[in-house]
């Protein structure tokens, strides 16, 4: 099991995200549960980012929305950084 750590930015954006997309609350809860179990499950589409976001990873919430994060494998911690549309989180 991994520990999810909500950064202040993720807490803020997740609150706003779920306010504007209440239909995605169950999907977000399911993705976070799956990430706690194993963030490398194929259906999460875990991937490393490049360029100015090098060192950050992302998982897919839906086709349009992503969650950016940092995984510290040695401590089994996942630091949640941002949530939003593809363009919003990869800016």
Give the predicted meaning of each segment.
Residues 33-59:
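A short, surface-exposed loop/turn module that caps and links secondary-structure elements
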């Amino acid at each position: 099991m991994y520990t999810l750590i909500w950064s202040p930015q993720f807490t803020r954006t997740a609150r706003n995200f779920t306010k504007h997309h209440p239909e995605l609350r169950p999907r977000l809860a399911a993705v976070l549960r799956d990430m706690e179990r194993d963030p490398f499950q194929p259906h999460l589409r875990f991937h490393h980012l490049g360029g100015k976001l090098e060192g950050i990873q992302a998982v897919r919430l839906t086709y349009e929305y992503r969650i950016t994060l940092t995984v510290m494998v040695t401590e089994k911690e996942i630091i949640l950084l941002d949530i939003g549309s593809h363009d919003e989180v990869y800016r």
